[in-house]
């Protein structure tokens, strides 16, 4: 039996999770929330994490009813992510490892999402759509690696949603994407936006620029038809949110279906913070059912960044014999999903 404590702090959430042989014992989390119209800067985010992390470690052990001596391994997010917040998690993980004399493992953030999704949903060998504020990838397992079949060629889908939420001054509480989703539910008026799919890759930066012009006509100089001439003042924020979701989610469904066909898969697993979006799940479910497949998705406890996913992935690594020398316990802002040898899967 492997009992693991995981620390996740790659972006604006700091989370601690404890798991033992696939059983969830604790999953606590705090979110750094900024005022409407503002994003989160690495330095301020790291400060938030520093102030919260030790209390969360204590809370997780109390919730799990465990002592430090009950743990077999300390796991932390090695990357990808923002360096200052990542360092907070890594430094605390190193300290606990030395203090408690427990092995230490660095975990890939994306691998954590995938393995947590597989554990919670029971998906066996799905095509994975990983959608978050920092990543957009279509992934499938093959020969001891999670292979990336398609991805964004510029910004992530969550970044596109977050930046548009800032443009129209939506609240960041509980998250910009959630508030876009709720606002979109009050409209069914579709405004045609750019649709950019290249094989199994997607692009969101042009869509964001285009819809920014619609939301703030005349703010930027551009060569295309002036927004005022398109009577953009007739568009409500709800119309824009609805249209943005419908467009970018259709793109994600298309590339996921293409990857399913390529891999011969009949399962789709959505992971990452954007995976909580009910409209994305609905569109993906329709596609899966039309193909005779099945959709797997989790709720906000597991799809949003959390320490539990790092604990679970780290426990799987530890169980399969993976060990990490202490001097390799660094962090990296760039850590590709397919760099990791998936030693714990035999299929």
UniProtKB/Swiss-Prot annotation:
Regions crossing the membrane: none
UniProt cross-references to SUPFAM superfamilies, sorted A to Z: Actin-like ATPase domain
Which superkingdom is the protein from?
Eukaryota
Enzyme type, top EC level = transferase
Look up the record and report any one GO term of the cellular component aspect. Answer: EKC/KEOPS complex
User: Sorted alphabetically, which Pfam families does this protein's record hold?
Assistant: TsaD (PF00814)
Entry binding sites for a divalent metal cation: 109, 113, 130, 305
Which note does the record give on the cofactor?
Answer: Binds 1 divalent metal cation per subunit.
Keywords of the record: Acyltransferase, Cytoplasm, Metal-binding, Nucleus, Transferase, tRNA processing
Molecular function as annotated in GO: metal ion binding; N(6)-L-threonylcarbamoyladenine synthase activity
Can you tell me which residues bind substrate? Answer: 130-134, 162, 177, 181, 277
Q: What is catalyzed by this enzyme?
A: L-threonylcarbamoyladenylate + adenosine(37) in tRNA = N(6)-L-threonylcarbamoyladenosine(37) in tRNA + AMP + H(+)
Q: Where in or outside the cell is it found?
A: Cytoplasm; Nucleus
State if Ribonucleoprotein is listed as a keyword: no
- Kindly give the InterPro entries that the UniProt entry links to this protein: ATPase_NBD, Gcp-like_dom, KAE1/TsaD, Kae1_archaea_euk, Peptidase_M22_CS
According to the record, the signal peptide region is none
This protein's cofactor list reads:
a divalent metal cation
Q: Its Gene Ontology biological processes? A: positive regulation of translational initiation; tRNA threonylcarbamoyladenosine modification
Which Enzyme Commission number(s) are listed?
A: 2.3.1.234
Query: What is the recorded function of this protein according to its Swiss-Prot or TrEMBL entry?
Result: Component of the EKC/KEOPS complex that is required for the formation of a threonylcarbamoyl group on adenosine at position 37 (t(6)A37) in tRNAs that read codons beginning with adenine. The complex is probably involved in the transfer of the threonylcarbamoyl moiety of threonylcarbamoyl-AMP (TC-AMP) to the N6 group of A37. Likely plays a direct catalytic role in this reaction, but requires other protein(s) of the complex to fulfill this activity.
Q: Which HAMAP family match?
A: Kae1
Subunit structure and binding partners: Component of the EKC/KEOPS complex; the whole complex dimerizes.
Q: Which family does it belong to?
A: Belongs to the KAE1 / TsaD family.
Q: This chain belongs to which protein, by name?
A: Probable tRNA N6-adenosine threonylcarbamoyltransferase
Which gene does this sequence derive from?
Answer: Tcs3
């Amino acid at each position: 039996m492997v009992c693991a404590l995981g620390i996740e702090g790659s972006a604006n959430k700091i989370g601690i999770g404890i798991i033992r042989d696939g059983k969830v014992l604790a999953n606590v989390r705090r979110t750094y929330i900024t005022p409407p119209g503002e994003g989160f800067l690495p330095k301020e985010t790291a400060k938030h994490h520093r102030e919260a992390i030790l209390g969360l470690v204590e809370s997780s052990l109390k919730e799990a009813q465990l002592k430090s001596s009950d743990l077999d391994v300390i796991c932390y997010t090695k990357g990808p992510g923002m360096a200052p917040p990542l360092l907070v998690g890594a430094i605390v993980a190193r300290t606990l490892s030395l203090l408690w004399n427990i092995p230490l493992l660095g975990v890939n953030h994306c691998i954590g999402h995938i393995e947590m999704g597989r554990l919670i949903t029971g998906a066996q060998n799905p095509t994975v759509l990983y959608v978050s504020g920092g990543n957009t990838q279509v992934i499938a397992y093959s020969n001891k690696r999670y292979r990336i079949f398609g991805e964004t060629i510029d910004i992530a889908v969550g970044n596109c949603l977050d930046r548009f939420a800032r443009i129209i001054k939506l609240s960041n509480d509980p998250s910009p994407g959630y508030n876009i989703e709720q606002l979109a539910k009050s409209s069914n008026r579709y405004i045609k936006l750019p649709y950019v799919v290249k094989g199994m890759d997607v692009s969101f930066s042009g869509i964001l620029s285009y819809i920014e012009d619609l939301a703030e006509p005349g703010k930027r100089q551009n060569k295309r038809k002036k927004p005022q001439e398109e009577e953009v003042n007739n568009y409500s924020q709800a119309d824009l949110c609805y249209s943005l979701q419908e467009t970018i989610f259709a793109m994600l469904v298309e590339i996921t279906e293409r990857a399913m066909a390529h891999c011969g898969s009949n399962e789709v697993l959505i992971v990452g913070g954007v995976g909580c979006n009910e409209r994305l799940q609905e569109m993906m479910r329709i596609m899966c059912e039309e193909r005779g497949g099945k959709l797997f998705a989790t709720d906000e406890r597991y799809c949003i960044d959390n320490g539990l996913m790092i604990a679970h992935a780290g426990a799987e690594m530890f169980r399969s014999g993976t060990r990490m020398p202490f001097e390799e316990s660094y962090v990296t802002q760039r850590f590709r999903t397919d760099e990791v040898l998936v030693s714990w899967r035999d299929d």
